Amino acid sequence: MSAGWRTLLLRIGDRCPEYGGSADHKEHIETCYGVLCREYEHSKDAMFEFLLQCADQLPHKIPFFGVLIGLINLENEDFSKGIVDTTHANLQDALHNENRDRIRILLRFLCGLMCSKVVLPNSIIETFEALLSSAATILDEETGNPSWQPRADFYVYCILASLPWGGSELFEQVPDEFERVLVGIQSYISIRRHFDDIAFSVFETDEGNSPNKKDFIEDLWERIQVLSRNGWKVKSVPKPHLSFEAQLVAGVSHRFSPISCPPPTISQSSSEIVKGQEKHEADLKYPQRLRRLHIFPTNKAENMQPVDRFVVEECILDVLLFFNGCRKECAFYLVSLPVPFRYEYLMAETIFSQLLLLPNPPFRPIYYTLVIIDLCKALPGAFPSVVVGAVHALFDRISNMDMECRTRLILWFSHHLSNFQFIWPWQEWAYVKDLPKWAPQRVFVQEVLEREIRLSYFDKIKQSIEDAVELEELLPPKAGPNFRYHSDEGKESTDGHRLSKELVAMVRGRKTQGDIISWVDEKIIPVNGAKFALDVVSQTLLDIGSKSFTHLITVLERYGQIISKLCPNEEMQLLLMDEVSAYWKNSTQMIAIAIDRMMGYRLLSNLAIVKWVFSPANVDQFHVSDRPWEILRNAVSKTYNRIFDLRKEIQTLRKGLQAAKEASEKAARELEEAKSIIEIVDGQPVPSENPGRLRRLQARADKAKEGEVTTEESLEAKEALLARGLEESKELLRLLFKSFVEVLTERLPPISADGDVPNLRAGDPNVNSSARDPEATTMEIDNENGGDNDSQLNGQNKKISHNVGELEQWCLCTLGYLKSFSRQYATEIWSHIAMLDQEIFVGNIHPLIRKAAFSGLCRPTSEGSHL
C-alpha cells in the first residue's frame, strides 16, 4: 500500500483510493493496522499523538480508531494505557476549562475504547456518575446555583449523547450499574427546570408556549428511552469492533481514573437581576448546540429511528465544527458519513438549523453559504433539489419567522443564487406582487432582489426574472445619484448651483479644509444660513465621492472636518442623514455605507442615527423595507465592536505594560549592580566598570523606562476611551429602548377591558378576505420530538394570501426587531438592566412591549421595575 499511515488513519471508513475504493470496514481496519504495525517502532510517538488528534477532530470515526487502539493493545499494553491516561488528563483539563466540545467528544472516545476492550466498563459508569452528581449539586439551592442549570444540562447531555456509541456494551457487561445511571438521569430530569426556548425559536407561534413541548434534554432522554426499549440497536453508529471481538477480548482493559468536576458557582445575591445575569452567563458558556428545524416531512428520513437522527445530526455538526475553514474537506466528509442510509434531507435541515440558530450561529453565516454551495456541487443529482424544497418550505412560513432569521435567510438566499447565475423559478412566486406591500412574502422577494442587485447589477437581475415579469414591480429603482445641483437641470443661476460649482472648483484646485471652511463661513452661512450650507456642502461632496466606495472614503477623509464643522449637534446630524438619504434615494446600499462611514469618522453619533431611524419617515417603512433596520443594526454593531476592540487593545497593553515594567526593572537593576562594583584607586573608591559600559547600561535603562511610561500613557488613553465608549453605549441602550417603547405605544392596539392582550396575528378581516385559501398549508413549527409536518414541502406553486392588516404587521415587525436587539445585545443590556427598569420598563407599559424585550433576554415578563 503506497499510502502513508497518516493518510490511512484519516481516510479510514471512507470509500477512497487509499483503500482501493472498498467500503468494507473490516478490510480498512486490517489494512491500516498492518501499516501501523510495520511503522510502529519508527513512529510510535507520532502515532500516539496522531491517533488522539484524529479521535478529537474526526469524532464520527471514533469506532474505527477505538478498534485500532484495541488491536495495538494486544501487542503493547503501555501504548493503550498511555492513550487512556492522556484521555483522562485531557478530559479533566476540558472540564475545568469548560471546553464543551472536547468534553463531549472525549466521553464518546471513552465509549469507543470501552467497546474495544481498552477501558473497563465500570470506569465509564464512574465517570457518568461523577457528572450526574455534579449536575444534581448545581441544581441544589443550598450547595449549588440553579441559575447555572445550563452547565448541569450539558453534563447530562454529554452522557446521553455518548450512549448510542456504547450503551449496548454497557448494558451487556454491567447491566446493574448501567441501570443505576439511567435511574440517576431520570431523577435529574424530574428535578430540573423545563427550558422554554421561545426566545430562540425560528418561528413566532402560540404553540411555543405549550407546556407539552419537550426541551432539548427531555427530547434526547426520550430518544434514549426508545433506544433502550429497542435493545440499544443503532444503525447510524458503526460497530467495527464486532468483527474483531474474538481478538479484542484477549486484551487487558485499563482503568480510567475518577474525574472531578469544577465546583458550582455560588450565587452572590438573591436579587432577581443577579440571578438573571448569572443565567445569561451560563447560557453563553453552555449554549444549546442544536435547535431542530423540521423543514421536511418525516417520510424523507429514510425510516430513520429517533436516535439515528440525533447521531447523524451530531456527526454533521462535528464535521462543520472541525472543518470550518476547509470547505472542500468539509463537503467531502459531510457526504461520506459512515451511515447505511441517505441523509440529504437531514443534512439540509441541520445546516439550515445552524444558519438560523439564535442568538448567533456558531460560525459566520458565509461559512454555511459556502458549505451549501459545495454540497450542491458534490451531490448535483440530489442536494440542489433538497435546497429548493427547503427554501420553498421556509418561504411558506416567512410571515411567522423571527426577524433576525428572516434577515439571515435573505442574505443567504441572495448570495446562494449569485453562485448559480441567479437562476430560480421566480414564476412560482409571482403571485406576491398582488399581496399587500407589507406582506412578509412580498417583502422577502423584494429584499432578495435588492440584495442580488448589490451582488451583481440591475439589468442582470431584471433579466433573471424575465419569466416572472410581474416581479419587476418589486425591483428597486435603478441605482444612481440624485444630485440636487446637477448642471443639466438649467438651474445654474440659483445660489445652490453657483455655490456648488465654486466648491467643486475649490476641491479640484486642492484647497485645504481650512480654506473651504473659511469660504463656507464667509460666503454661505451669513447669507443663506447653516442648514443651506450643509445642504450645498453635503450634496456636492457626496456627488464628488459618488463614483465608487473608494471615492466616498477619500472625500470623507479629506473633507470630513468641513462636514463636522457644519454638524456640531444632533439636529444638524439628522439633517445630514436626510441629505444622504435624498442623494442616494435610489440606493439602499449606498445610504447604509455612507452613514456607516460617517459614523466611523465620527461625523455622525450613534445617538443621532437612532433618532433618525425612529423619525416618522423611517418609522413608516419599518414593515415594508429593511433599509432603516440595516442602518440601525450597523450603528449598534459598530458601537459595541469599538468597545470590544478597545477591550482587546487594553488587554494587550496591560500585558505589554507588565513586560515593560519587568524590562525597566531589570535594566535599572543591572545599572545599579554595575555602579555598585567599585575599586580603590589612589585610596579613593571609583567604579570598576568600564565607563562605556556604564553609559550603555544607563541608556538602556532610560530607554526601558521611557517605554514603560509610553505604554502606561497609551493604556490610560485607551482606558479613557473605553470609559467614554461604555457611557455612550449606556446612552445608546437608553435611547434605543425608549424609541421602541414610544413608537410601539403609539400604534399597538390597547388592552381590552377584561385585560386581554390583543392578538396581532388575528389580522384585519377586511384584508384579502375574498382571496383567502382555506386549503393553504404551512410547515409545522420545529418541535423536538420530530412530529409530522402537515404541509406539502416539495416546492409546489401554492398561492398563500396574507390576512394581517398593515398596522398589525407594522407592530409585529417592530416587536420582532425589539426582541432581536434584546437578544443580540443581551450581555450589554443585562449590565444596565437596573437603569432600564427604572427609566424605560416602568408604569403601564404595554405587555407586548415587555414580552418582546424580556423574551429576548430570557427574562420572565413578571419581572421589571419592582425589582
Swiss-Prot record:
Q: Which GO terms describe its cellular component?
A: cytoplasm; nuclear cap binding complex; nucleus
**Which Gene3D superfamilies does the record cross-reference, listed alphabetically?**
1.25.40.180
Q: Where is the composition biased (Polar residues)?
A: 788-797
Compartment annotation: Nucleus; Cytoplasm
Chief location bin: nucleus
Q: Where is this region: Disordered?
A: 752-797
MIF4G domain segment(s): 9-228
* Cross-referenced InterPro entries: ARM-type_fold, CBP80, MIF4G-like_typ-1, MIF4G-like_typ-2, MIF4G-like_typ-3
**Keywords (A to Z) from UniProt:** Cytoplasm, mRNA capping, mRNA processing, mRNA splicing, Nucleus, RNA-mediated gene silencing
Molecular-function GO term, any one:
mRNA binding
An annotated GO BP: alternative mRNA splicing, via spliceosome
Instruction: Give the SMART domains listed for this entry.
Output: MIF4G
Q: How does it assemble?
A: Component of the nuclear cap-binding complex (CBC), a heterodimer composed of ABH1/CBP80 and CBP20 that interacts with m7GpppG-capped RNA.
The family annotation for this protein states: Belongs to the NCBP1 family.
Q: What does the UniProt function comment say about this protein?
A: Component of the cap-binding complex (CBC), which binds cotranscriptionally to the 5'-cap of pre-mRNAs and is involved in various processes such as pre-mRNA splicing and RNA-mediated gene silencing (RNAi) by microRNAs (miRNAs). The CBC complex is involved in miRNA-mediated RNA interference and is required for primary miRNA processing. In the CBC complex, ABH1/CBP80 does not bind directly capped RNAs (m7GpppG-capped RNA) but is required to stabilize the movement of the N-terminal loop of CBP20 and lock the CBC into a high affinity cap-binding state with the cap structure.
Would you tell me the protein name for this molecule? Nuclear cap-binding protein subunit 1
